[in-house]
Amino acid sequence: MTRPLWDYYVSSSHNTYLIGHQLVGESTIEGYIRALLHSCRSVERKPIHSFLFLTHIVFTAVDIFDGDKEPLVTHGNSFTTKVSLRKACEAIAKYAFVVSPYPVIISAEIHCSIPQQDMIASIMREVFGESLVSAPVKDRPKINHLPSPEELKGRILLKVRFDLCSVTYQANSCE
């Protein structure tokens, strides 16, 4: 577990927050809990392609949209229910390292306004605390390759994809 992270395949799941059908199913934190407790190492889109197969890194997906008060996790353009981003993060924080000490990678697809993006950052900092990777790993001044799973034990990484159309629209409408 000392090679760079990208040298490992990561076992994955899709729409971890959904129970049932992806167009009309229920969104719940139970999917995250189940995945974490069964060593499911999940991703929304594609696994990390490389040489070794690793089953102890969680790669889990979160589709985040504006909520009335705080951001919500739901499947866009569908009739699925919604779950609080805070509750999803709390479930991930509670169960992330019960089965494995290796990193959890959250793949977030952001469809939120700028104010709710700020809330996402605040919620994740508050809930994940020091576990959230927010700077280069200690003693790695320049990133030529990703840290190893060993270096990332007990850490949560965030991989983000923004819906630039909604962000651009939001910025232009604020003028």
Ranges and model annotations:
Residues 1-42, 49-59, 65-175:
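Long, acidic (Asp/Glu-rich), low-complexity accessory segments flanking structured domains
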